[in-house]
């Protein structure tokens, strides 16, 4: 505070000195004009035109204008708080910024995302379904014509076994395709295979009126096997 008061006093003194110098220079100029063309000198050739001399006298009131800087002296007073402001920057709020590194913790939850693709391994149980296939081929081993004629109803159930046989060939292309991509497309061909199974048994039943029922069944199974393999290959290509 003492320093600020000293600064303000120095500013006032300087302003007063400057005002005094300005007034002295103005007075000296007026004195020069008066001595050069004063009304006292009657022999002055410029006495008659000296009438405009009052103009310098009019300028004489101008010296008070330099005195106005005195009010400006209080202006330095506000500058005194300036030294006090540097004390405020002492706030060490900036070191708190390192707290932001806490945000990198968020990416950690994203790391488990790559682990989720491991879930597509679930389709692996699908190949286990073909296990019943070896048991079903035992049924067509009895090609008795009399039994086929007497029991036409079981014929529709017989075509069901060939459907599981197709998945045996399906696992071969399955490993070639990436596990995470196929699970989405692989379920599509599965329902298509059973759709074709019930359609063909109808024709086999109509043809099972005589002893030629056995070859028709084998032909239907071969067709189903071909169509199933083609569907599986097409699904694998689409997945790629």
Curated annotation (Swiss-Prot):
Keyword Signal: yes
Biased composition (Pro residues): 51-86, 104-137, 153-192
Keyword Glycoprotein: yes
Induction entry: Up-regulated by TBF1 and upon milbemycins A3 oxim derivative (A3Ox) treatment.
Positions of region (Disordered): 41-216
Lipidation (GPI-anchor amidated glycine): 219
Prosegment residue ranges: 220-240
Low complexity bias (residue ranges): 87-103, 193-216
Bilayer topology term: Lipid-anchor; GPI-anchor
GO cellular component: plasma membrane; side of membrane
Keywords: Cell membrane, Glycoprotein, GPI-anchor, Lipoprotein, Membrane, Signal
N-terminal signal peptide: 1-18
Compartments, record wording: Cell membrane
Principal place of residence: membrane
Glycosylation, residue list: 207
Protein known as: Predicted GPI-anchored protein 58
């Amino acid at each position: 505070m003492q320093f600020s008061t000293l600064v303000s006093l120095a500013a006032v003194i300087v302003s007063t000195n400057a005002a005094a110098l300005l007034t002295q220079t103005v007075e000296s100029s007026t004195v020069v004009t008066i001595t050069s063309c004063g009304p006292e000198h009657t022999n002055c050739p410029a006495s008659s035109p000296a009438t405009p001399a009052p103009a310098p006298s009019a300028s004489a009131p101008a010296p008070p204008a330099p005195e106005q800087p005195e009010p400006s002296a209080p202006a330095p007073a506000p500058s005194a708080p300036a030294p006090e402001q540097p004390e405020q920057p002492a706030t060490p709020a900036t070191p708190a910024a390192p707290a932001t590194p806490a945000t990198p913790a968020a990416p950690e939850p994203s790391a488990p995302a790559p682990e989720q693709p491991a879930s597509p391994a679930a389709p692996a149980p699908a190949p286990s379904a073909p296990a019943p296939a070896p048991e079903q081929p035992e049924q067509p081993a009895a090609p008795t014509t009399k039994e086929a004629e007497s029991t036409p109803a079981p014929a529709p159930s017989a075509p069901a076994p060939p459907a599981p046989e197709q998945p045996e060939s399906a696992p071969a292309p399955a490993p070639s395709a990436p596990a995470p991509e196929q699970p989405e497309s692989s379920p599509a061909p599965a329902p298509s295979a059973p759709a074709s199974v019930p359609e063909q048994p109808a024709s086999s039943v109509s043809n099972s009126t005589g002893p030629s029922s056995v070859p028709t069944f084998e032909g239907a199974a071969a067709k189903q096997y071909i169509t199933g393999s083609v569907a599986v290959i097409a699904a694998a290509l689409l997945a790629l």
